[in-house]
Amino acid sequence: MTTHTQDIGKEVSSVIAQSWHRCSKFMQRETWQAPHQAQGLTFESICRRKTALLTIAQAALEDAWEFMDGRPCALLILDESACILSRCGDPQTVEQLAELGFRDGSYCAESIIGSCALSLATMPGQPTKTSGDQHFKQALHPWSFCSTPVFDNHGRLFGSISLCCLVEHECVSDLSLTLAIAREVGNSLLTDSLLAESNRHLNQMYGLLESMDDGVMAWNEQGVLQFLNARAALLLHLDAQASQGKNINDLLNLPMLLRRAIKHARGLNHVEVTFESQHQFVDAVITLKPIVEEQGNSFILLLHPVEQMRQLMTSQLGKVSHTFEQMSTDDPETRRLIHFGRQAARGSFPILLCGEEGVGKELLSQAIHNESERASGPYIAVNCQLYANSVLGQDFMGSAPTDDENGRLSRLELANGGTLFLEKIEYLAPELQSALLQVIKQGVLTRLDARRLIPVDVKVIATTTVDLANLVEQNRFSRQLYYALHSFEIVIPPLRARRNSIPSLIYTRLNSLKKRFSSSLKIDDDALAQLVAYSWPGNDFELNSIIENIAISSDNGHIRLSNLPDYLFAERPGLETASSLLPASLTFTAIEKEAIIHAARVTSGRVQEMSQLLNIGRTTLWRKMKQYDIDASQFKRKHLE
């Protein structure tokens, strides 16, 4: 071992000295064994894995060889395991190396060829030169090898570039040459890697932009369209491929608000506008993002589809839960309401619900909505008392966007695809009555300060506590709107006319309070009887309020007669009480006649509804009416000329 070490030249690097030290332990200097060689599919697989290195390095080596003027040397490309991937240079030199076993696919490992720059450059990862007797193996003493490693963009060893020649042809600049080539290859690999990564990110971005529900457009300061995703092309009726490169003003008639924002490089955020494209009007909610640069401003425009924005808004604010299944069926009046309510749910025609305050008109409206095909759509409730004059008309009818503020969606548009519940329709201002009539008859709306018609698909359910026919005669309500609403009218009788349903309503309310208070509630029979006997001038609303109050004030959830407020025991003048409905002195004939008259009042003299309410056939009802000299037409509401 000492002898071998002493044979090294005096001025060698520590890398070579350490290599000699390793080699002297397991190999002989005098013997030579050709390196192992990868062939066939194995070598092809290695080359495929190193395609990037080969593509760049082969071009670099060929360029370098052209400037060597036929110098007798060879240039090699090796991978990180010192496997020769490619050779070029002087044919005679290449052939001489091949005789030693340095061919494509040969592994130049230190364990086979000993101390040599081909293997050493890949081990410490630094440029290395071995020449003459610096090689451990005597077979390589006639040769000079210079090798420089190539690193990828992560700093990992990716391969090496080597120059080989006989000692008599070596130059002092050989190592510098391999270093220059290796750096060129490394820089090219880095550039290609960054470009590939940039393209990958760009493809991901394009994929993201194409998969968005929003339309996306981008153009430069000259207005030249640079990007248009498929969604934007669909919304604006444009050809995505043919439109790119054209001026956006040649493709679209931009709204004034957007043109001014572009002129002043001012952003817009969720502004509703209307484009004109291919002779069609297109509604969209837009967001404009200016990109201010030294070379000029560019712009990115997002188009949010109006329908999706409306669906998102209404899904958050327009859901109701009351259904017909929650309504008591103990009373024939309530069964009648359920029957006609389900009929009303089948069509898209407007509905008018009539009745006193607090009889549950909105609950019936909710049940109709949830029974209809529009159940998944919005349910927008509007108290028309808030719109008794046109001051708040902008909220009801919406407004077009201006330079100073965004447009506003109307209540009618918010209800699009669902139900619009108009409470106390008699208070609606005349101007708004006309707008509502336009929606009912034509299915379109004109916003305030706008001229364009907006399609609106809503089912209108209105309520009233007065006789609208009288208001029409007094010119206080639109005659045409009354006719439109009167096409399907449901009269909800007061609670005192639905006494059989009172116990069920009470127990339903108590069950609701049980869940809220997380405690048991029960009511004595005499207390229940007194509640049934009360005339309930405030109807269902009053009933719910009183039940909650007495439940709170009861002892341990036990409602006794003593818990009821005093006024429930006193008869109020002018109100029907339970005892006055059916006096004990009446005969059966008088009771029957009174029941028919009451049914005629409730149904406005509609015989079909009277027969259903009384649970008798129409023929029998006609006979009884003739017997008691009852004329149903006397109870009909006065018809308008």
Curated annotation (Swiss-Prot):
Cross-referenced Pfam families: GAF, HTH_8, PAS, Sigma54_activat
Keyword line: Activator, ATP-binding, DNA-binding, Glycerol metabolism, Nucleotide-binding, Transcription, Transcription regulation
GO annotation terms (biological process): glycerol metabolic process; regulation of DNA-templated transcription
GO MF term (any one): ATP hydrolysis activity
PROSITE patterns referenced in this protein's UniProt entry, alphabetically: SIGMA54_INTERACT_1, SIGMA54_INTERACT_2, SIGMA54_INTERACT_4
Region (Sensor domain): 1-318
Domain PAS intervals: 203-265
Keyword match Disulfide bond: no
Presence of keyword Transcription: yes
Record InterPro entries: AAA+_ATPase, GAF, GAF-like_dom_sf, Homeodomain-like_sf, HTH_Fis, P-loop_NTPase, PAS, PAS-like_dom_sf
Task of the protein: Transcriptional activator of the glycerol utilization dha operon.
Protein name per Swiss-Prot or TrEMBL: Glycerol metabolism operon regulatory protein
Species in which this protein is naturally found: Citrobacter freundii
Gene name tied to this protein: dhaR
